Amino acid sequence: MADPFEVLGLPRSWRVSVEDIRAAQRKCSIAAHPDRQTDPASRANALQLSSRINAAASELLDPLSRGAAIVRALEPTPKPPEPRQNPAFLMRMMELREAVDQAAHNALDRNAVATQIAQELRVIELETDLAMVALITRPQVETWSAAVDALNRLRALRRAHEESAR
């Protein structure tokens, strides 16, 4: 799988803005546009490149996918085992899921649970931000493992947040 940062000509950054991603996508799309090609083989190649450009932009626009791309690109060799989830975090996720289920028929309870999950999500987002920046600035086994763990926790809490909003 191609590095989406390389495809768009962007520096690898967790904090890349939507505006920067869209601007890079436009710039690359203009340069690779199939209408700029005259022969069928070049058009087909340009069409493939355009598809890769759009896929790279989509990947970078989603923070979880962007994080996965960074983790993939900075994966140590040999690849260490993925970190195990913290049992306390897993227990907390079970508690939140139970709270969501119990609050399913009461709007006030549902809102309270959603607010609690949103607060915990903000904390995990900050932790993920720090872990990803550390990985980019100091790519080592320890920072890679911390970034993978943070992304896994972020993914789990986002799922819980989506469930609480239903």
Predicted regions and their residues:
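C-terminal accessory/regulatory regions appended to core domains
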Residues: 1-166
